[in-house]
UniProtKB/Swiss-Prot annotation:
SUPFAM superfamilies cross-referenced by the UniProt entry: ArfGap/RecO-like zinc finger, Nucleic acid-binding proteins
Organism: Halorhodospira halophila (strain DSM 244 / SL1)
Record Pfam families: RecO_C, RecO_N
GO cellular component, one term: bacterial nucleoid
Similarity annotation: Belongs to the RecO family.
A biological-process GO annotation: DNA recombination
Gene: recO
Name of this protein: DNA repair protein RecO
Length: 234
C-alpha cells in the first residue's frame, strides 16, 4: 500500500515524537489499524484534532509499517467523554490495539466502534459495547457460537449454561469450566441488534461473559482501563 486518501478514522493512541511530531495509532474504516507519524503537528493545526473520540478524515503515504500523515480533517463533532464513559472508550481502544494487526481491515468492528462512541456520550452504551466486542472477536477469528450448545442442540432461553470460548455452551451441571449464564443471555448476544441486553440479569451476565472471553484472548495482558473502572467505583 503506497498510501490512502480521505479515509474515515479514529485515533486510538498518540504520543509525542521528536520535537514537533506525534506518533498515532489510527483505526481506519477501509484499512483497519494504521501506525503513522504526524509531522509539524502544531504548525499544521492538527494538535486539537489528533485526539481520541474525534471522527476524522485522514490521508497518508508510505509503504512501510509506519505511514506519514499528509492531511487530517475533522469529520464531525468530537465527544467529550467523562468518568465511566471515558473508561469505556479507553477500553475499546485497548482491546483494538491488543487484538488487531496493522492493515487488517475490520469494517464491521469500525462501524460498531463509531456507534458505541456515540452511545457513550448520549445513551446507555452497554448493548453497543457488547456488539462492538462481538464484532471484534468475529473479525479477529475468535467468533462465538451463541445459538447452539456443544452438542449441536439449540440454546434454550430458560436453561442455564456454562460457556467457555474453547468449547462453547454446555448445560450447567455437566461441567465446571466456563462462565455460568442463562440461555436468554446467549440468545440476546446472538441477536443482530442486541435486543434485551439492557435488562437485568442478562445485562450483567453478558458483561461478565464478554469480560472473560476478551481476557482469555488478551493472555496475561492487563488493561489500564479496568484499573480506571475500579478507581471510579472506589
Amino acid at each position: 500500500m503506497n498510501g490512502a486518501q480521505g479515509q474515515p478514522a479514529w485515533v486510538l493512541h498518540r504520543r509525542a515524537f521528536r520535537e514537533s511530531s506525534t506518533l498515532v495509532e489510527l483505526f481506519s474504516q477501509e484499512y483497519g489499524r494504521i501506525g503513522a507519524v504526524a509531522n509539524g503537528v502544531r504548525r499544521r493545526g492538527w494538535s486539537g484534532q489528533l485526539e481520541p473520540f474525534i471522527p476524522l478524515q485522514v490521508s497518508w503515504r508510505g509503504r512501510g509499517d509506519l505511514k506519514t500523515l499528509t492531511t487530517v480533517d475533522q469529520a464531525g463533532r468530537g465527544y467529550a467523554l467523562r468518568g465511566g464513559a471515558l473508561a469505556c472508550g479507553f477500553y475499546m481502544a485497548e482491546v483494538l490495539l491488543a487484538l488487531t494487526r496493522r492493515e487488517d481491515p475490520h469494517p464491521r468492528t469500525w462501524e460498531r466502534y463509531a456507534v458505541a462512541v456515540d452511545c457513550l456520550a448520549t445513551d446507555d452504551a452497554e448493548p453497543a459495547l457488547r456488539r462492538f466486542e462481538l464484532a471484534l472477536l468475529e473479525e479477529s477469528g475468535y467468533g462465538l457460537e451463541l445459538e447452539q450448545d456443544v452438542h449441536g442442540e439449540p440454546v434454550v432461553a430458560q436453561a442455564r449454561y456454562r460457556y467457555s470460548p474453547e468449547r462453547g455452551a454446555d448445560r450447567a451441571g455437566t461441567g465446571e469450566c466456563g462462565v455460568e449464564v442463562s440461555g436468554a443471555t446467549l440468545l440476546a448476544l446472538a441477536a443482530t441488534e442486541g435486543q434485551g441486553l439492557s435488562e437485568e440479569p442478562v445485562r450483567s451476565e453478558a458483561r461478565r461473559l464478554m469480560r472473560a472471553v476478551i481476557q482469555q484472548h488478551l493472555g496475561g495482558r492487563r488493561l489500564r482501563s479496568r484499573e480506571m473502572f475500579r478507581s471510579l467505583r472506589d
